[in-house]
Curated annotation (Swiss-Prot):
<dbReference type="GO" id="GO:0022625">
    <property type="term" value="C:cytosolic large ribosomal subunit"/>
</dbReference>
<dbReference type="Pfam" id="PF00298">
    <property type="entry name" value="Ribosomal_L11"/>
</dbReference>
<dbReference type="InterPro" id="IPR036769">
    <property type="entry name" value="Ribosomal_uL11_C_sf"/>
</dbReference>
<dbReference type="GO" id="GO:0003735">
    <property type="term" value="F:structural constituent of ribosome"/>
</dbReference>
<dbReference type="InterPro" id="IPR036796">
    <property type="entry name" value="Ribosomal_uL11_N_sf"/>
</dbReference>
<dbReference type="GO" id="GO:0070180">
    <property type="term" value="F:large ribosomal subunit rRNA binding"/>
</dbReference>
<comment type="function">
    <text>Forms part of the ribosomal stalk which helps the ribosome interact with GTP-bound translation factors.</text>
</comment>
<dbReference type="InterPro" id="IPR000911">
    <property type="entry name" value="Ribosomal_uL11"/>
</dbReference>
<dbReference type="InterPro" id="IPR020784">
    <property type="entry name" value="Ribosomal_uL11_N"/>
</dbReference>
<keyword id="KW-0689">Ribosomal protein</keyword>
<keyword id="KW-0687">Ribonucleoprotein</keyword>
<dbReference type="InterPro" id="IPR020785">
    <property type="entry name" value="Ribosomal_uL11_CS"/>
</dbReference>
<dbReference type="InterPro" id="IPR006519">
    <property type="entry name" value="Ribosomal_uL11_bac-typ"/>
</dbReference>
<keyword id="KW-0699">rRNA-binding</keyword>
<comment type="subunit">
    <text>Part of the ribosomal stalk of the 50S ribosomal subunit. Interacts with L10 and the large rRNA to form the base of the stalk. L10 forms an elongated spine to which L12 dimers bind in a sequential fashion forming a multimeric L10(L12)X complex.</text>
</comment>
<keyword id="KW-0488">Methylation</keyword>
<keyword id="KW-0694">RNA-binding</keyword>
Length: 147
């Protein structure tokens, strides 16, 4: 078995799927760790080609020999909620001004998408987490079942 490489850095970025380029924020973040920026951009764009239009968070692990691995995460719940509600941005005063609404089924669908990144035992609890995020953005959730 090959010896383990020593990790020198962990970089977390949120980049538009299929649209990574050497311009900020990608270039400066990777350049500081000595990573080949174009190599990462090509690999990321190829891996996220099917998710175009979404923002896909990525965790990049940089090793001592300047090689790297990256792990894709699921799109942020806030972005998925904005898309589901059909609005551009959340409310500036979420508990006063309501800017849109989503159904409980839409919350469950988003929870299904994000389940691997959520700290929940089942889809029902995951949907409650998503509903809480929606409320904090000024989006009302219709049809929430009682506990």
């Amino acid at each position: 078995m090959a010896p383990k490489k020593k990790v020198t850095g962990l970089i977390k970025l949120q980049i538009e799927a299929g649209a990574a380029n050497p311009a900020p924020p990608v270039g400066p973040a990777l350049g500081a760790h000595g990573v080949n920026i174009m190599e990462f951009c090509k690999a990321y764009n190829a891996a996220t080609e099917s998710q175009r239009g979404n923002v896909v968070p990525v965790e990049i692990t940089v090793y001592e020999d300047r090689s790297f691995d990256f792990k894709l995460k699921t799109p942020p719940a806030a972005k998925l909620l904005l898309k589901a509600a059909g609005i551009k941005k959340g409310s500036g005063v979420p508990h006063t001004d309501k800017v849109g609404s989503v159904t409980w089924d839409q919350c469950k669908e988003i929870a299904q998408t994000k389940f691997e990144d959520l700290n929940a035992r089942d889809i029902e609890n995951g949907a409650r987490i998503i509903a809480g995020t929606a409320r904090s953005m000024g989006i009302t959730v219709d049809g929430v079942p009682a506990k």
